[in-house]
Each structure stands twice: as C-alpha cells, then as structure tokens.
Amino acid sequence: MYMQVETRTSTRLHLKRAPGIRSWSLLVGILSTGLAAAYYSGDSLGWKLFYVTGCLFVAVQNLEDWEEAIFNKNTGKVILKTFSLYKKLLTLLRAGHDQVVVLLKDIQDVNVEEEKVRYFGKGYMVVLRFATGFSHPLTQSAVMGRRSDVEAIAKLITSFLELHRLESPSERSQSSDSEPDGPGGQS
C-alpha cells in the first residue's frame, strides 16, 4: 500500500506511510546475519559486537522512512513530514525529522510519476506540482507494485483540493478573453 488515509473530513486529509513488509524483512535478514556471525564465530567479544553493530547499522540504513502528509483547508497549508530512524541514530537523536510546509493555493496539479527502482523494475509516486514551477514528491521513495494504489491516492488528493473544479472557471475566462469583440466593441 502506498499511503493509508488516517483521517478524512471536508477540511482535513491526513495520509500516513510506514515501512513496508519488504523493508522490515530486509532489516530482520541483515540483523540475523550479524547475530549468526557473532554466535558461530570463535572471535573475541569485540569482534562479535562489531558484527552485530555493523549489521544493525546496515539494516537500519535500508529501512524506509515513516512519512505523513496533512492537507488542512482551515490553515491553508500542506505539511509533509518524514521521520528517519537512520538519521536519528546517525546524529545521536539530534535530527531525523524533516518537514516541508506548502500553501494549498500553490498546488496546481497532482500527478503519478514512474521511477526506476534499481534491480527491481519500476516504482510509482505521487508528485505535487506548484504554481512556481517546482514539484515535490508526496513521499521520498517510490512504491513498487500496482500503479492503481498510487493513482487512487492522487485522485483522493485532487478531489480533496478540488483542483479540477478550479480549472473550469479559468478555462471559461480564457476562452471569453480570446473571443472577438461584439458589434458594441468596435469603433
């Protein structure tokens, strides 16, 4: 699953993502290798601690981040939060939380983009496009699997932000601006 809907009201949409089963399986597998190396080796205690610590470090490095997106119409902001256990351990608990705050009115479009995932094929992610020309992914990593899960989240965000309804009046005003003046407008 790409992201789970935590809460959904007319003014607030809260999406969450936690590390998936692949990520946890990789953590257990790498950590088990370190524990097995320490248990079955005849090395000193220092080396055994090195095996376990090294494998724990590599395992946590490969763990996906916890991510959440909060769209709030009352404040007019989107808050994208990321929590990384690896950064938290690496900086000795000083960092690990990243946060991006964007105004809702700056979001022009929501797209699904395809990204190559090394060794595994294709992954998909939702990208927010802003009026300034910049774009920002909803999550930091692409999800492998079905594109339909990611498209469902993109449609949910689009309907919550009413992006397609906002385009219709502007299209009408552009078409009325391009129409030739009537008989009263000519001199």
From Swiss-Prot:
Name the principal localization, coarsely classed.
Answer: endoplasmic reticulum
Q: Which InterPro entries match?
A: Cybc1 (IPR027846)
Post-translational modification Phosphoserine, affected residues:
168, 170
What membrane topology term does the record carry?
Single-pass membrane protein
Q: Which GO terms describe its cellular component?
A: endoplasmic reticulum; endoplasmic reticulum membrane
> Organism's domain of life?
Eukaryota
Record-given protein name:
Cytochrome b-245 chaperone 1
What organism is this sequence from?
Mus musculus
- Originating gene: Cybc1
